[in-house]
């Protein structure tokens, strides 16, 4: 038994399922999860001391690589002054100014402690501002575990949502409508059914929780136009894509302007953090300037602000995103080339520092129903083959992969050579 396996057995005695977030349990791929002891650059090291080239990056935040010296120095300097004050700090102001300078649609921003807090608060604000109860989300998109968001579509386009988890009253779920990602007609159908009831659309601009699904041309702007037509707010959830896809997020990359934006992951530099921001008139509707309540003991935590600021400043380096995109393209297209070489059907998607691959004969993947038709068993085999080769991918066929600036020529070469060997063995076994 490895030390990771022993720790997992020990953890299950005191932690539900042995993990503090379900995907970490490896239920999507089978086997026991790795317990991580440390990380540096493009590598993570498990409890047995084995190194892995990491394409999870703490699920997105580690865009510069693990344990980056500038971020580490910023955190250590901040710790000297105390860990938490529960009062305003100059660091919060600096972070707000940095975010606003990088994302033109954000005129004011409020810091919180997680992505779930950010989306939950943005939706409450949209409901309060519009005085409407219903929200519209998309099948396959994930916006955190707030009750109103753990909702799946009903049996028809016009049916009300159904809870996707026990513990969520149907009275909550009935206010959440679910449309088809990359399908404007499904959105318009719902708005025509509820023309004065929908407060907002919330969307992942690149869906990163059904693997990696970019928007088709015109989709995001089409949502913007529908919101304007029916008086709803557009919330772009950039918890994953913010400063990961481009310096101004996915909204800058695709040229669409939301009313509200949610942020997380990258803006914390690896520390727990979230934020939501947008139009000043909307943001002024939140307490203490407005009637919509939102608060948090650790919001704007000085350690998190220090780490985030250090990372955000580093991301302003000229040419950084072009380099990151080139790395992502090389890995995604390298996987596809290796699969083609061995006669294994595969589709790929990638944008900025995110990528996804699908074992499927479908030529392209643009919707959730297409994702569910992919070969999950082939993914599991590939996943464990790559893990044995020292490459750590997301342990789920429904999660995006992430590159960092620390992934160099050596790491990419080793990764693609490993993929070639694993795919060759999969073909031989078939």
Curated annotation (Swiss-Prot):
The keyword Cytoplasm applies. Its cofactor is pyridoxal 5'-phosphate. Its EC number is 5.4.3.8. The modification N6-(pyridoxal phosphate)lysine is found at residue 265. GO terms for molecular function: glutamate-1-semialdehyde 2,1-aminomutase activity; pyridoxal phosphate binding; transaminase activity. Pathway: Porphyrin-containing compound metabolism; protoporphyrin-IX biosynthesis; 5-aminolevulinate from L-glutamyl-tRNA(Glu): step 2/2. It comes from the Bacteria. PROSITE patterns: AA_TRANSFER_CLASS_3 (PS00600). One of its GO terms (cellular component) is cytoplasm. Its main location: cytoplasm. It catalyses: (S)-4-amino-5-oxopentanoate = 5-aminolevulinate. One of its GO terms (biological process) is protoporphyrinogen IX biosynthetic process. It is found in: Cytoplasm. Keywords: Cytoplasm, Isomerase, Porphyrin biosynthesis, Pyridoxal phosphate. InterPro entries: 4pyrrol_synth_GluAld_NH2Trfase, Aminotrans_3, Aminotrans_3_PPA_site, PyrdxlP-dep_Trfase, PyrdxlP-dep_Trfase_major, PyrdxlP-dep_Trfase_small. Homodimer. Belongs to the class-III pyridoxal-phosphate-dependent aminotransferase family. HemL subfamily. This is Glutamate-1-semialdehyde 2,1-aminomutase. It comes from Shewanella baltica (strain OS155 / ATCC BAA-1091). The gene is hemL.
């Amino acid at each position: 038994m490895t030390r990771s396996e022993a720790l997992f057995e020990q953890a299950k005695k005191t932690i539900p399922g042995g993990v503090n977030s379900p995907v970490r349990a490896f239920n999507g791929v089978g086997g026991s999860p790795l317990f991580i002891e440390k990380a540096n650059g493009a590598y993570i090291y498990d409890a047995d001391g084995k190194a892995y080239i990491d394409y999870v990056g703490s699920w997105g935040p580690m865009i510069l690589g693990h344990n980056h010296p500038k971020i580490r120095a910023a955190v250590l300097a901040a710790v000297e002054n105390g860990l938490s004050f529960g009062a305003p700090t100059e660091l919060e102001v600096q972070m707000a100014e940095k975010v606003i300078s990088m994302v033109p649609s954000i005129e004011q921003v409020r810091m919180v402690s997680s992505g779930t807090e950010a989306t939950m608060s943005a939706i409450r604000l949209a409901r309060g501002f519009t005085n409407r109860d219903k929200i519209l989300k998309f099948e396959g998109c994930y916006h955190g575990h707030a009750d109103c968001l753990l909702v799946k579509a009903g049996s028809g386009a016009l049916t009300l949502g159904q809870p996707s988890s026990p513990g969520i009253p149907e009275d909550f779920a009935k206010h959440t409508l679910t449309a088809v990602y990359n399908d404007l007609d499904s959105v318009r159908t719902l708005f025509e059914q509820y023309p004065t009831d929908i407060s907002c659309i919330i969307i992942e601009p690149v869906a990163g929780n059904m693997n990696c699904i970019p928007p088709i041309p015109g989709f995001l702007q089409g949502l913007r136009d529908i919101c304007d037509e029916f008086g709803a707010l557009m919330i772009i959830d950039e918890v994953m894509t913010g400063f990961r896809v481009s310096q101004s997020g996915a909204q800058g990359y695709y040229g669409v302007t939301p009313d509200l934006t949610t942020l997380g992951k990258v803006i914390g530099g690896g520390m727990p953090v979230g934020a939501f921001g947008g139009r000043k008139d909307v943001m002024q509707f939140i307490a203490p300037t407005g009637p919509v309540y939102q608060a948090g003991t650790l919001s704007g935590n000085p350690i998190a602000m220090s780490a985030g600021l250090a990372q955000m400043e580093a991301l302003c380096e000229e040419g950084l995103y072009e380099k990151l995109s080139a790395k992502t393209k090389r890995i995604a297209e390298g996987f596809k080339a290796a699969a083609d070489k061995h006669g294994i059907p595969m589709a790929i998607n990638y944008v900025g520092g995110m990528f996804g691959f699908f074992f499927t004969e479908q030529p392209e993947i643009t919707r959730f129903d297409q994702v569910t038709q992919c070969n999950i068993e082939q993914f599991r085999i590939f996943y464990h083959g790559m893990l044995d080769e020292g490459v750590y991918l997301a342990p789920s066929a429904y999660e995006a992969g992430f590159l960092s600036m620390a992934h160099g020529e050596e790491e990419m070469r080793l990764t693609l050579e490993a993929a070639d060997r694993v795919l060759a063995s999969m073909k031989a076994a078939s």
